[in-house]
Amino acid sequence: MPIKAVRRTVFAISAGVAFAFALLPSTTPASAADGTETIVLIRHGEKPPQGLGQLNCQGLNRSLRLPAVVKARFGVPAAIFAPNPADQKTDQGEAYDYVRSLATVEPTAIAFGLPVNAGIGVEDISKLQARLEDKAYANALVLVAWEHKQLVKLARKLMKDHDGDPDSVPKWQGDDFDGIYVVKLSRKGGDTAATFARQAQGLNGQPATCPN
């Protein structure tokens, strides 16, 4: 076959292959990130009257029973977040390192063999939100243990920013250590829709004495 004819044949085959690939459905970063992220928000456990930035024995007992609740209700998290324990919080007029939330979620992290992301300040909700909105968690379960007023701010902001109703997120009562706020972010084709639901751990009434 003459060289020119060979070249024409090769060109025709190459053009045909390129056309065939062009007809295939494309996989874009947006489609790769489609899915539903479940963000489970829990408050720290019960605290002593003086605050101390710490849990009391009842809060400790709650934290020890939390892993079973999380696994049965939601499954095993892909990531766990708690505020930076080096941040100080004022309790009864005294400033203490704020370890309550981390102490609450630490048994869960240990039970599941997970690290705790604890590098964000307790009031830096914008930074926490940005981490939670990372497309790496598009199909993931994420557990967040935090201060209850900041959790309400976070949940309302997530709802507002993702086509949800921020007013659907109620105030978190000061005596409620059992609540679970669940925000789901459903991503599809570059759009994100948020939904909210409130649940309960079912762990009230734990012993007021610490385990031996």
Report the location of each language-model feature.
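N-terminal secretory signal peptides that target proteins for export/translocation
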Residues: 1-6
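Catalytic-site microenvironment of enzymes
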Residues: 9
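Sec/Tat signal peptide C-region and signal peptidase I cleavage site
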Residues: 26-32
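Periplasmic-binding protein-like
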Residues: 141-145
